[in-house]
Amino acid sequence: MEIAQFKSIKQNFVRELKAANAGKKTSLPFIVHKLSSAPIVEDGEDFEALVIGGSIFKRAICKKTIDKISIIKKERELPLTFKTEKEFLEFIDGELSKDVNILSLNFAYPIKPVFENGKLDGILLAVTKEGGFDGLVGKKVGKEIEGYIFRKRKKKISVSIANDTICLLLSGLTRYRWSELAAGIVGTGLNLAIFLDKEGLVNLESASFDKFPQSKEGKIIDQQSVKPGRALFEKETAGAYLYKHFSL
């Protein structure tokens, strides 16, 4: 691909970004989040953080103090995939510590943010990265986890969930001002996030960007994928598909 073509793709992306910010429908979902006005974790309280990536899992027990969050215990990292909602909920139940009441979920899939009872939940909008989650699309992920844990353990927990790119963007606030930050993840999938202002963030769901010429290999990969016609930019750039370009 020539440099001029890369520049053209960049210009198209910027146009899509500006149009989405103006409220127009574009290939970028442009999912806006607002920061919660109050934390759900008390000072001195332990909570559990789970990272559900496109192909990996991470777990940590953390403690919140007045001025920082400390990792008390960081555990294994392993590959994972979920075909159904049941598999996902059973996995969460198996990994959730019995000693915590709050679960923070870093979730690598497109979710629509929903504030409920003072905490951030998310409705799973679709499945990317050739994932499954059958039965979970269209549901509030945090609420489903809370209900499942209560049925299994007779214990009430609070779950807060955000897209992984939003989590990455927020982590930058520990070192930089919001106006200096943007976040990008190029792993199993592809996504970007930006700040609109001090309290507003946007998950672009960049995988859906389609204002570019597909490669010959990309067209074949798309046709053979679980969701043809969707996440076209991701299918040209991300780890779940990139190796296939060299096999065709």
Locate predicted features.
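Active-site core segments that coordinate phosphate-bearing ligands/cofactors
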Residues: S37-P39, L169-S171, R175-G184, L190-L248
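Short amphipathic alpha-helices and their capping/turn segments at secondary-structure boundaries
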Residues: D46, E85-N101
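Gly/Thr-rich phosphate-binding beta-strand-loop-beta motif of the actin/hexokinase/Hsp70
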Residues: H33-I72, P113-V114, W178-K198
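N-terminal charged helix/coil linker that caps or initiates catalytic domains
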Residues: M1-E48
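Low-complexity, highly charged intrinsically disordered N-terminal segments
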Residues: M1-K10, S104-N106, K119, V127
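Residue-level signal for inorganic ion chemistry
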Residues: R59, L105, F246
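Short glycine-rich phosphate-binding loop at a beta-alpha junction
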Residues: F47-L50, D99-A108, V159-S160
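Glycine-rich phosphate-binding loop and adjoining helix at the ATP-binding site
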Residues: I72-E90, I111-Y176, E180-A182, G200-S208, ...
